[in-house]
């Protein structure tokens, strides 16, 4: 009893424990927790409001309702503490014990715990080896279960057998009364459970496992073995799943609150408990009265149902409802779901010392400041003010101080100023999608009621001033203030952690001002003047002698960085130079920090340029200078924009002159297609696709014409010649600078609105030819409203989906922290530039920046080391590597990091948000999840229908060289020469490479099967030359051998049909679909065999397989029977489906699909081994493909007939090569090609989605997620470890176990990699607290309780839930220091004990000598 109370005592100081264990409570345990039995269903007396004795709120059991006062009021005050009143039996103590003291109910009949019955898989069913249906029938009194066969003959009846009422009666008559025992209800199940000998069961199952060969049985046994072993190791008895005692929750946790008007609000649990008590008491009475069996049975069933409802209402049958027909909230519902205990109260708490208000812009603030309304500050900093008032002696008590503050005397404001100085506060804007959503600022007191926010941090908060609100939090403790100041201050967070780009980029007005000031103009006022310095320029400008945009020459003094190591001015060298520039740029150059050249701003500053400028400043001049520079840029931008006075008029929207013509042409083309459709030349779908194409193209043409007219104007220069210059049109300037609007929006204003989509996403074929300047008619307006509304609906959906993705990502990575500097890994991944279709999508520079290299990087010519092994590659290194034209670099990656239960800094590389090597303790997992989740709302939700123009654009028919060099072919390329001497490609995965003069690969192209190569290997090619061509609409089948074609099973009307071309009148044979053939010819496969002149079969080179070429459905046969066939000749062509509009999952769903590792529908089939392909006997709808490996072992695949098989008889394929077309399955890639290939696949696919939206995310974030998806392995052979085959284990745990086994000289376990989707990976984590707070709480807790799981509190989430510092950042070092300290204390205690023992055992004379050496060793 006492032990339990100690568990609930308020902790004094830091309660130190390292693990939390969960298990099942035995009846004795429940009774030991309890302070008394609850016998009555009464709650409180409605007149006196005092709790009823022995009821659900009984003060005797649960403690007094008022502090230090018994119920009858005999004992009051502190002096009677601990006394038990003899009149009312209440102990005099604190009232808050009512939050921790439990009671119990002694059940009149045992009851099964619903979680272990109904939570799938049913644990009761597993242990008893019975079906859930049977157990339910017994528990709910529909059937008997045999507990003891007794005197019945051998084999007539066995223990655990189920029998219905009628059978029971029949058997009783047959064998006599009392010959055997069969019971109904939980008692029967309990007796069965008690009769199980777990050790023996485990042995039998292990023996069965060894003996059996069937997969289904192995699975079944393994499941049961797992549950039984769990009971064995945890020491939990199976019969505890049946409850004889029910614990009662402390009353304060299920309160009863009086409302005005004499009514009460109560927790649903009280209702549920009342039902249990009522039914239990009634059952007790019935048993005492020896009521008829049927009545007792019904009451027992009702008791079981009442307890079920209390534990998990609605899990079985109908949910119990209260008076208002609403289902009652049971214990299970209290903890699960969004509003359950875990997510509502433990992971998301409300915070004291916080406030919220609307934000307004604060253009005069410095970057690290924010404006805080005085009244808000007064409320938030109250305790500090009280303290100050007392220390100054202005107020004597807190009460007086409170009065002083409330009257807001002048002294209070002075003290507020003082208290607030240098005390950072945190601002947060919901939704907090990444770590920059909370930043610390120094408050400046302001009048008014709105918080002022610095404009430059808006990008990070994603805030604007259209009514956004922000919350303020005050860090109270000194440590918290220090962390807020050093880690969270806005001026210390200038880079996005997602991609390392600056986050303090100006936008809108500022960009417009800077752009306007740095544009130059032909023939402006004062053009051609020369100035000695910037002061002169300013003077001339202010005197009105020169315009802001005039082109002038200025002498400018710059400071170049010469010595990076030096401090202060010693770093720079001064140099002066005359620049051709504009007045605005010269004036702006004043704000450049030292170390930046004038070249950097001697161009029109668009948004991208400004971002680059800030980035350069950060890398060259450091954080402090950059922050000052950004602030100055902001001030200048605002000032210049104001002075510029840019405004917009309707006349600025120029409608292109060619618009009418383009629209007329398009209309005529559409009419032409309508005619063709009417006369039946094209299908309706084709007509629709073409119409949509035409209008799409017309819209683009109008847009282009408009931009051309808008962007340039003709002006006279100084010599009165007409020249074109960029226009100063306001709308164009806004779009061009990146301040507001885009070309697409201007197109709607001044071009044509173009095609609109219906709500279902399909495109309406009549476009809106008008623009907003001309105005829309009613029909056009109506069509437009569709799109606008769909946009809003989509956004709402998207936000929810994106948030859910972020939550899953955070959950899977939450425990990944950098825990050491270097793991010593020597493997990594070789990075190259990303090339698609011969174009570089991502340069090598961006891919290796901020990574640690493996091995020295040497100069390609001189072989001298430029970058040493294990160096973090920064901008300078990368520039050097790129300049030397090195095109691949091996770098460390998160996936090959050897650190267990974490990561090392070297494998992670640069911390993108700070710019140096990542610190130990950084929670890189959560950062990765935020970086991927945060842009989620910008991704699209829809599935793209690709049809018409879009799909036609996808069909390439040749490869063009992009650069000069020598042509090389990859090792997988196989070529034959045909009769014309052309080179025909007969490999599926061949690649053509172009190598430059230095021997470096410039580009790489995939060459499809059947393509004709136009150059020989090693030929020199020029940029723009065509390397290979092919027919994009058909796939050929090419003969690799010469001979005479002999048809096999090619019968007209049976397997092939004659098709006559309408235009040419030529006939060809087409293979018909098996489904459309007659029954007899269903399984027959048409083939072409090659025979030589003598009629013998031509064999495949190096084998004894004849050359049989199978023809697929739809193949057009181009040779005749008996025709002579040359090498490289086309035997048949398979038309590619005229690019059906296929759906491409894009955007958010695609990202989710990749991270959930879902196998795609109709996935590609990859070869499991390297070997030779042949076709076996076909089944009804499938063809059998056999790959025979080098040892002669055959691997069979069954492939649906309608699938495109990419290989043919006799072809040699490599392991992991695609043999059937389709999207790749990540699981196959992992098993056949390994972790590295899988990572490359997932990273590339995810990046494709984000790149399409123009979002930059660093690869390493995606790699971090992939590492977490691979964190479990499957045991293939347990070796001498405790693991069984087929079990899934945490990788780090297995490595640890293997180390121990190897050290002992035994056999380690063998395993294979498993890829888990993020949801599954989160749920399979070793921490049950983390898994339970994520999803499927009931299942997770049920499983954990049976296994008696311990949670080692390794992740961040578990620690947040139990309320201690997270093991990341400062928390990690705190925890390590504590461990060291504890170890030291232990060692010291041992030494002292050893000394004392030594002293006790030593003869007295030589005592002095013994103590001396021990004294030296004392660590203190």
From Swiss-Prot:
Cofactor note: Binds 1 Mg(2+) ion per subunit.
Alphabetical list of InterPro entries matching this protein: DNA-dir_RpoC_beta_prime, DNA-dir_RpoC_beta_prime_bact, RNA_pol_asu, RNA_pol_N, RNA_pol_Rpb1_1, RNA_pol_Rpb1_3, RNA_pol_Rpb1_3_sf, RNA_pol_Rpb1_4
Domain of life: Bacteria
Cofactor: Mg(2+); Zn(2+)
Sites where the protein binds Zn(2+) 2: 823, 897, 904, 907
GO biological process, one term: DNA-templated transcription
GO CC term, one of those recorded: DNA-directed RNA polymerase complex
Catalysis performed (reactions): RNA(n) + a ribonucleoside 5'-triphosphate = RNA(n+1) + diphosphate
A Pfam cross-reference name: RNA_pol_Rpb1_1
Keywords from the named record: DNA-directed RNA polymerase, Magnesium, Metal-binding, Nucleotidyltransferase, Transcription, Transferase, Zinc
Binding of Zn(2+) 1, residues: 70, 72, 85, 88
Binding site for Mg(2+): 464, 466, 468
EC number, UniProt record: 2.7.7.6
Keyword Zinc (UniProt): yes
Subunit structure: The RNAP catalytic core consists of 2 alpha, 1 beta, 1 beta' and 1 omega subunit. When a sigma factor is associated with the core the holoenzyme is formed, which can initiate transcription.
Family stated for the protein in its record: Belongs to the RNA polymerase beta' chain family.
PANTHER family: DNA-DIRECTED RNA POLYMERASE, DNA-DIRECTED RNA POLYMERASE SUBUNIT BETA
General function of this protein: DNA-dependent RNA polymerase catalyzes the transcription of DNA into RNA using the four ribonucleoside triphosphates as substrates.
Protein name: DNA-directed RNA polymerase subunit beta'
Higher taxonomy: Bacteria, Pseudomonadati, Pseudomonadota, Betaproteobacteria, Burkholderiales
């Amino acid at each position: 009893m006492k032990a339990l109370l100690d568990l609930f005592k308020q902790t004094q100081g830091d309660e130190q424990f390292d693990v939390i264990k969960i298990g099942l409570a035995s009846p004795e345990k429940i009774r030991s927790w309890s302070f008394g039995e609850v016998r009555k269903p009464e709650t409180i007396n409605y007149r006196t409001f005092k709790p009823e004795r022995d009821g659900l709120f009984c003060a005797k059991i649960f403690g007094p309702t008022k502090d230090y006062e018994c119920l009858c009021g005999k004992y009051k005050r502190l002096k009677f503490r601990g006394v038990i009143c003899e009149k009312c039996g209440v102990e005099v103590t604190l009232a808050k014990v009512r939050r921790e003291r439990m009671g119990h109910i002694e059940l009149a009949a045992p009851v099964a715990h619903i979680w272990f019955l109904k939570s799938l898989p049913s644990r009761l069913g597993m242990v008893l080896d019975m079906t859930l249906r049977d157990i339910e029938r017994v528990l709910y009194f529909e059937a008997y279960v045999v507990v003891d066969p007794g005197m019945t003959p051998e084999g007539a009846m066995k223990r655990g057998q189920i029998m219905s009422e009628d059978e029971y009666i029949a058997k009783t008559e047959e064998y006599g009364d009392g010959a055997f025992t069969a019971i109904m209800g939980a008692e029967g199940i309990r007796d069965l459970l008690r009769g199980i000998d777990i050790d023996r069961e485990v042995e039998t199952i292990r023996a069965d496992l060894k003996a059996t060969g069937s997969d289904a049985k192995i699975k079944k046994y393994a499941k049961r073995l797992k549950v039984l072993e769990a009971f064995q190791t945890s020491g939990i008895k199976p019969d505890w799943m049946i409850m004889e005692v029910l614990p009662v929750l402390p009353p304060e946790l299920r309160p009863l609150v009086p409302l005005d008007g004499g009514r009460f609000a109560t927790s649903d649990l009280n209702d549920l408990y009342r039902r249990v008590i009522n039914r239990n008491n009634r059952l007790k009475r019935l048993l005492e009265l020896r009521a008829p069996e049927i009545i007792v049975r019904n009451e027992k069933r009702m008791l079981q149902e009442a307890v079920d409802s209390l534990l998990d209402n609605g899990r079985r049958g109908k949910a119990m409802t209260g008076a208002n027909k609403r289902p009652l909230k049971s214990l299970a519902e209290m903890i699960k779901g969004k509003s359950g205990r875990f997510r509502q109260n433990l992971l998301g708490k409300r915070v004291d010392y916080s406030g919220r208000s609307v934000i307004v812009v604060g253009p005069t603030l410095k970057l690290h400041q924010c404006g805080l309304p005085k009244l808000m500050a007064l409320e938030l900093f109250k305790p500090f003010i009280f303290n100050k008032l007392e220390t100054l002696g202005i107020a004597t008590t807190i009460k007086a101080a409170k009065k002083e503050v409330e009257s807001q005397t002048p002294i209070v404001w002075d003290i507020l100023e003082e208290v607030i100085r240098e005390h950072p506060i945190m601002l947060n804007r919901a939704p907090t999608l990444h770590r920059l959503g909370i930043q610390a600022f120094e408050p400046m007191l302001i009048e008014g009621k709105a918080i002022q926010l610095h404009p430059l941090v808006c990008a990070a908060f994603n805030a604007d001033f259209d009514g956004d609100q922000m919350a303020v939090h005050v860090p109270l403790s000194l440590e918290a203030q220090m962390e807020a100041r050093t880690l969270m201050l806005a001026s210390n967070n200038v880079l996005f952690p997602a991609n390392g780009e600056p986050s303090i980029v100006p936008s809108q007005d500022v960009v417009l001002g800077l752009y306007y000031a740095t544009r130059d103009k032909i023939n402006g006022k004062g053009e051609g003047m020369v100035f000695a310095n910037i002061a002169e320029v300013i003077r001339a400008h202010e005197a009105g002698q020169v315009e802001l945009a005039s082109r002038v020459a200025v002498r400018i003094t710059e400071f170049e960085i010469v010595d990076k190591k030096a401090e202060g001015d010693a770093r720079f060298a001064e140099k002066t130079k005359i620049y051709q520039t504009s007045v605005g740029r010269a004036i702006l150059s004043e704000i450049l920090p030292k170390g930046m050249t004038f070249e950097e701003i001697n161009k029109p500053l668009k948004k991208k340029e400004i971002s680059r400028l800030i980035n350069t400043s950060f890398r060259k001049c450091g954080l402090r200078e950059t922050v000052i520079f950004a602030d100055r840029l902001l001030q200048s931008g605002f000032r210049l924009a104001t002075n510029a006075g840019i405004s917009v008029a309707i006349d600025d929207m120029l409608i292109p002159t060619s618009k009418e013509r383009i629209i007329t042409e398009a209309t005529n083309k559409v009419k032409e297609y309508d005619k063709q459709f009417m006369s039946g030349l094209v299908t309706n779908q084709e007509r629709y696709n073409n119409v949509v194409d035409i209008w799409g193209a017309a819209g683009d043409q109008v847009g282009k014409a408009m931009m051309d007219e808008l962007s340039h104007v003709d002006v006279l220069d100084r010599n009165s010649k007409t020249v074109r210059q960029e226009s100063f049109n306001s709308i164009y300037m806004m779009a061009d600078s990146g301040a507001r609007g885009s070309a697409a929006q201007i197109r709607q204003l001044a071009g044509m609105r173009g095609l609109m989509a219906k709500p279902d996403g399909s495109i309406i074929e009549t476009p809106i030819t008008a623009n907003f300047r001309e105005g829309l008619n009613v029909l056009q307006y109506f069509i437009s409203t569709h799109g606008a509304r769909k946009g809003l609906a989509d956004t709402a959906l998207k936000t929810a989906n994106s948030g859910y993705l972020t939550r899953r990502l955070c959950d899977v990575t939450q425990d990944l922290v950098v825990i050491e500097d270097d793991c010593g890994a020597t493997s990594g991944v070789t990075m190259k530039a990303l090339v698609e279709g011969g174009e570089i999508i991502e340069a090598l520079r961006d891919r290796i920046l901020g990574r640690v290299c493996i091995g020295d990087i040497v100069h390609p010519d001189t072989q001298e080391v430029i970058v040493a092994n294990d160096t973090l590659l920064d901008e300078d290194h990368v520039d050097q590597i790129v300049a030397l034209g090195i095109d691949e670099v091996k770098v460390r990656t998160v996936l090959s990091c050897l650190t267990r239960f974490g990561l090392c800094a070297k494998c992670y590389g640069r911390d993108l948000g700070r710019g140096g090597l990542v610190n130990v303790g950084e929670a890189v997992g959560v950062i990765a999840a935020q970086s991927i989740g945060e842009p989620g709302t910008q991704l699209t939700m829809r599935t793209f229908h690709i049809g018409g123009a879009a799909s036609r654009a996808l069909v390439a028919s040749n490869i063009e060289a992009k650069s000069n060099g020598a042509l090389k072919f990859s090792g997988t390329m196989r070529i034959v020469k045909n009769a014309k001497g052309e080179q025909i490609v007969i490999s599926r995965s061949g690649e053509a490479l172009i190598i430059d003069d230095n021997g470096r690969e410039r580009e790489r192209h995939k060459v499809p099967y059947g393509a004709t190569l136009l150059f020989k290997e090693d030929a020199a090619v020029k940029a723009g030359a065509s390397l290979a061509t092919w027919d994009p609409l058909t796939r050929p089948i090419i003969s690799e051998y010469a001979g005479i074609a002999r048809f096999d099973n090619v019968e007209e009307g049976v397997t092939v049909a004659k098709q006559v071309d309408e235009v040419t009148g030529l006939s060809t044979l087409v293979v018909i679909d098996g489904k459309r053939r007659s029954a007899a010819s269903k399984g027959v496969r048409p083939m072409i065999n090659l025979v030589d002149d003598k009629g013998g079969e031509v064999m495949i080179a190096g084998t004894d397989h004849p050359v049989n070429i199978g023809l697929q459905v739809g193949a057009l046969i181009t040779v005749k029977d008996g025709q002579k066939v040359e090498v490289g000749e086309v035997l048949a062509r398979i038309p590619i489906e005229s690019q059906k509009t296929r759906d491409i999952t894009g955007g958010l769903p695609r990202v989710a699909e990749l991270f959930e590792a879902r196998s795609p529908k109709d996935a590609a089939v990859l070869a499991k081994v390297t070997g030779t392909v042949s076709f076996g006997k076909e089944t009804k709808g499938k063809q059998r493909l056999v790959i025979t490996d080098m040892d002669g072992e055959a691997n069979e695949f069954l492939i649906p007939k309608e699938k495109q098989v990419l290989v043919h008889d006799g072809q040699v394929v490599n392991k992991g090569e695609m043999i059937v077309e389709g999207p790749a399955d990540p699981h196959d890639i992992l098993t056949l090609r390994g972790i590295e290939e899988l990572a490359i696949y997932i990273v590339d696919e995810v990046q494709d989605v984000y790149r399409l939206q123009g979002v930059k995310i660093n690869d390493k974030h995606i790699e971090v997620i992939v590492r977490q998806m691979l964190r479990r392995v499957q045991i293939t052979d347990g070796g001498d470890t405790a693991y069984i085959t087929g079990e899934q284990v945490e990788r780090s745990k297995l490595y640890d176990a293997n180390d121990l086994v190897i050290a002992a000289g035994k056999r380690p376990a063998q395993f294979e990699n498993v890829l888990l989707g993020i949801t599954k990976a989160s749920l399979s984590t070793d921490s049950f607290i983390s898994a339970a707070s994520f999803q499927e709480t009931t299942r997770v807790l049920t499983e954990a309780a049976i296994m008696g799981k311990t949670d080692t509190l390794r992740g961040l989430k578990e620690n947040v839930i139990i309320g201690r510092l997270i093991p990341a950042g400062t928390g990690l070092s705190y925890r390590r220091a504590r461990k060291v300290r504890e170890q030291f204390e232990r060692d010291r205690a041992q030494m002292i004990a050893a000394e004392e023992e030594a002293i006790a055992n030593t003869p007295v004379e030589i005592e002095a000598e013994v103590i001396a050496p021990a004294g030296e060793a004392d660590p203190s």
